[in-house]
Amino acid sequence: MNTLDETLLKEIISSNKKYTNYGQVASYIPELKNARRNDLGICIIDSENNLYSAGNCSTKFTIQSISKPIVLAMALMDNDWEDVFSNVGMEPSGDPFNSIMKLEINDTKKPCNPMINAGAIVTTSLINGSCLEEKEERMLSFFRKLAKNDNIGINYDVYKSEKMTGDRNRAMAYLLKSDGFIRGNVEDVLDLYFKQCSIEIDSVDLARIGINLANYGVDIENGEHLMSEMVSRIVKTFMMTCGMYDASGEFAIKVGIPAKSGVGGGIMASVPGRMGIGVYGPALDKKGNSVAGVKVLEELSNKLKLNIF
């Protein structure tokens, strides 16, 4: 087995850089098409709080769907978990992340899981707060605490772009509201959802969040309980079964690490008890996952024996 160090990470980045040519940056949200297609970076923070990085690890990008497990954690902390899962399911969908189809054909009508757009809109509606502003501040505060970065904020150019082009998400939200799964005002829920997807981070932030999840919800630096062990376990389970869109099964076989991707090009991975990983590569495959990022994680998992199965 190889030893984790920056030399290894630089080798892995170098050997997988060619895969950045095999994908395309997201363009359906206009602001995302400004990303540099050939960027590729990684950061790892291990259980001893050692940080290793290589490539474009400090490049800023928006979190997009990687926000979903974090907002799920908030929903589980704010509500009884049976209440959460009476509104959103626990099963992989096998459909694209923005599909509406199963909201109509499923017997329950509720979203299959919290890692697809419909499910994440539901969990966003379950965040406590007396008004939209309080919910937004609580959400940002939680992201900042998990990442140990008080400078994390919303990229308002991306937020406006998301809001302007978010008709499909609007359709989902109003359908879910009509079936009783959305709590509160639909437009307020959507506004918070678009803002959470527009939070700007880098690979170091993702690695820090990943290690705190890997450490069962306990801050690796100061021992603070950021979430319960049960919540961290539920979140990592969804990352494993549903975190890579409709390529989650293939990723589980080839990589075997709980992970969540986003169309901004990021992937956050959490190896229980061992490390948190943040990867950035904005060239995406047809399912919305970073082409080179997945390859980087596959090689890393094989070389460090990270597969949890």
Curated annotation (Swiss-Prot):
EC number: 3.5.1.2
PANTHER family: GLUTAMINASE
Organism: Clostridioides difficile (strain 630) (Peptoclostridium difficile)
Record flagged with keyword Hydrolase: yes
Record's keyword terms, sorted: Hydrolase
Entries under HAMAP family matching the protein: Glutaminase
Quaternary structure (record): Homotetramer.
GO MF annotation, one: glutaminase activity
InterPro entries recorded: Beta-lactam/transpept-like, Glutaminase
Gene3D superfamilies hit by this protein: DD-peptidase/beta-lactamase superfamily
Domain of life: Bacteria
Keyword Transferase listed: no
Positions with a binding annotation for substrate: 65, 117, 162, 169, 193, 245, 263
UniProt cross-references to SUPFAM superfamilies, sorted A to Z: beta-lactamase/transpeptidase-like
Example GO BP: glutamate biosynthetic process
Protein name per Swiss-Prot or TrEMBL: Glutaminase
Family designation: Belongs to the glutaminase family.
One Pfam match: Glutaminase
Catalytic activity annotation: L-glutamine + H2O = L-glutamate + NH4(+)
